[in-house]
Design a protein with these regions (language model features):
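Short glycine/proline- and aromatic-enriched beta-strand/turn motifs that initiate or cap beta-hairpins
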Residues: 18-65, 212-214
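Residue-level detector of the transmembrane beta-barrel scaffold of outer-membrane proteins
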Residues: 23-27, 72-74, 122-126, 175-177, ...
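Extracellular/periplasm-exposed beta-strand and loop segments of Gram-negative cell-envelope proteins
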Residues: 33-54, 78-106, 132-162, 181-204
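Cleavable N-terminal export/targeting peptides
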Residues: 1-22, 214-215
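Structural signature of Gram-negative outer-membrane beta-barrels, strongest in the C-terminal barrel
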Residues: 114, 121-135, 158-164
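Outer-membrane beta-barrel "beta-signal"
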Residues: 23-25, 171-173, 201-215
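Residues on the lipid-exposed face of transmembrane beta-strands in outer-membrane beta-barrel proteins
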Residues: 30, 57-65, 77-79, 107-113, ...
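Outer-membrane beta-barrel channels and translocator barrels
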Residues: 19-22, 66-70, 116-120, 171-174, ...
Length: 215
């Protein structure tokens, strides 16, 4: 995964440095509101909560060019750590269900419209659309406290689309934006009885800050 991040960042940086009138954005963001899809396998109980166990974060690099007055178009790559859903406890059977950690590396097209106003603080609208390479840190775990056993179920988080839309402001090349984002995903489990695949999209509102370099 780290190799993918470094390769993507190196590629975008080279494109930015090789092109004239190019903008390079370096940003970091925090998920101030989060929601996972709730998984309910066939003939089974819910295995996760929609809330996250902690705040997610991301590190992003984007490169754009102005293709029309006030309109920028480009590409981006981001490392996004979503954490995992809060553990689900079944008090009737003294069982705890732990979901694996969920991370993504989306590669996407991005567009930014700078609203033309006579001010040092420049508002803008922004949208992203791309593909999310998703990864989970381990397997689904059923922890039976009564028996003192932990059962692991082989699991995988499949890739999917990524998109986001929002608005922000720019001041002296510093940028800050607030965006609604979704990473589409499927949660797949494998047992001796077969495989299951359920929607496991991650939705959130992300507050990002960063700096724009002009080349």
């Amino acid at each position: 995964m780290i190799k993918k991040i470094l390769l993507g960042m190196t590629t975008l940086s080279c494109i930015a440095l090789a092109s004239q009138d190019t903008n390079l954005y370096l940003k970091t963001g925090a998920d101030i509101w989060q929601k996972f899809d709730v998984i309910t396998p066939r003939d089974s109980e819910t295995i996760n909560r929609k809330k996250a166990d902690r705040m997610g974060y991301e590190l992003t690099i984007e490169t754009t060019r102005e293709i029309y007055p006030n309109l920028e178009l480009g590409a981006g790559i981001s490392y996004q750590d979503h954490g995992s859903t809060k553990s689900l406890n079944d008090k009737d059977f003294d069982i705890k269900l732990d979901m694996p950690k969920f991370t993504s590396i989306p590669i996407y097209l991005t567009t930014k419209y700078n609203i033309p106003i006579n001010s040092n603080i420049k508002p803008y609208l922004k949208a992203d659309l791309g593909y999310s390479f998703n990864h989970n840190s381990g397997d689904l775990k059923f922890i039976d406290y009564e028996l003192g056993e932990t059962i692991k179920v082989s699991s995988d988080i499949k890739n999917g689309l990524y998109f986001g839309i929002g608005a922000g402001v720019e001041y002296n090349n510093f940028v800050a934006d607030l965006m609604y984002k979704i990473n589409k995903a499927k949660f797949e489990t494998s047992t001796p009885y077969g495989k299951t695949k359920d929607d496991f999209d991650y939705s959130r509102v992300t507050l990002s800050v960063g700096y724009k370099f002009n080349f």
